[in-house]
Design a protein with these regions (language model features):
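Catalytic nucleophile-elbow at a beta strand-turn-alpha helix junction centered on a G-D-S/GDSL motif
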Residues: 180-204
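Glycine- and acidic-residue-enriched helix-capping/strand-helix junction motifs
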Residues: 98-100, 193-201, 294-297
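N-terminal secretory targeting modules
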Residues: 3-10, 20-182, 358-365
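Histidine-centered active-site loop/cap adjacent to the catalytic His
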Residues: 334-365
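Substrate-gating cap/lid alpha-helix
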Residues: 283-321
């Protein structure tokens, strides 16, 4: 508890001091806009915390998951501007890097601009590798005219402030969301986004652009084990469909003990909403490790058996098998478990047609 209070105090101090510093150092040839005043999408719940996945005070979240749920994972900002260049200044709470993801994934920004109805990659906000204060150009030298922009936030850090910078005198305004539906994803580190190259390259973000839907991301690295607090979040959330990567962190015993109650709770809260469960990945780190192979085989076997039974009992529950799919050539992950960009593409090629077919039944298209 003391550690959490210290962390929250640090966040408050960082937010106050850096906002003052940035305001005092604004360049005379740039205008700045607080991103939280623009259109925020991919939130599971509209809770007044625009740059955090959730307001954790609303739930009984265990200590090990609280920080993860205050991260900006999956959140994006929609805005319109006629600026010929776009940049950003933002602050995060944690320095340092991990071993199985890029600095862009953890701390960077990812900008897309809509062109002829499609979201097209435009540039990235390159984060500092030494500090929690970041400044970066995103795109320069654009043609004149209004652009419709979508800016993805860092995937594995808490963002305490974000300002978008544009040419002096340029228009920046909230963009009405073009997304009519919301498909919420819940799961493990794979759903969290590990190990896509950048925030907009995760399978959840790409799914959203491909199907033209909002995609709140409640993927928590190493922590999705069919726990009650995940069910609490799902029950409180408002979405047109839910997709679950629920077996990647769960042992076979977790699945046996918790799956039925988990399904009962979420279907009671959302009786007419499609609940789509994905089979977990066939892990390449188990190719020669017999212990890892036994664990992965047990996960997959129990998940398949129980989901077959559950799907026969609940008309709005579905099981996609294979689900998360890295391919059969052993080249689809960064470390034998987490999808690289090739694995992301293969997973999307596998699940998108199947999920589209399910969603069509509910007039979600």
């Amino acid at each position: 508890m003391k550690t959490i209070l210290k962390l929250l105090l640090l966040v408050a101090v960082v937010t106050t001091t850096t906002s003052t510093a940035f305001a005092a150092s604004k360049s005379t040839n740039r205008d700045w806009v607080d991103a939280s005043t623009l259109t925020v999408i991919n939130k599971a719940i509209d809770d007044g915390k625009p740059l955090n996945r959730l307001d954790i005070s609303q739930f009984n979240i265990p200590k090990h998951a609280r920080l993860y749920l205050t991260q900006s994972t999956g959140i994006a900002i929609l805005f319109r501007t006629n600026s010929r260049s776009i940049g950003a200044v933002w602050t995060t709470t944690v320095k340092g890097q991990g071993v199985n993801y890029t600095p862009l994934f953890r701390n960077g920004l990812d900008l897309y601009i809509r062109e002829k109805g499609e979201w097209v990659f435009a540039g990235v906000g390159k984060p500092s590798t030494k500090n929690t204060e970041h400044r970066s150009a995103l795109v320069k030298n654009m043609e004149e005219g209004m652009k419709e922009c979508m800016l993805y936030l860092p995937m594995h850090n808490v963002v305490t402030s974000l300002n978008i910078t544009v040419d002096k005198g340029a228009i920046v305004e909230p963009m009405p969301s073009p997304f009519k539906h919301k498909v919420m994803f819940v799961g493990s580190s794979i759903t969290h986004g590990f190990s896509a190259a950048r925030p907009g390259a995760s399978y959840v973000a790409r799914f959203g652009r491909e199907l033209n839907v909002e995609t709140p991301n409640i993927g928590l690295s190493g922590k999705c084990k069919l726990d009650d607090f995940f069910a609490d979040i799902v029950c409180a959330a408002k979405a047109d469909a839910f997709v679950f990567d629920a077996f990647s962190n769960s042992t076979d015993e977790h699945i046996k003990e918790r799956l039925r109650n988990f399904v009962k709770r979420i279907t009671t809260a959302h009786p007419n909403t499609p609940m789509i469960f994905l089979q977990t990945i066939k892990r390449d780190n188990a190719n020669f490790d017999s212990v890892a192979r036994k664990r992965n085989d047990a996960q997959r076997t129990v998940a398949e058996k129980m989901m077959t039974e559950i799907c026969s009992q609940y008309k709005n529950v579905y099981f996609i098998n294979p689900g998360i799919y890295a391919g059969d050539d052993h080249e689809g992950t960064i470390d034998g478990v987490h999808l690289n960009d090739l694995g992301v593409q293969r997973t999307l090629d596998n699940i998108v047609p199947k999920i589209k077919k399910i969603l069509k039944k509910y007039k979600i298209k």
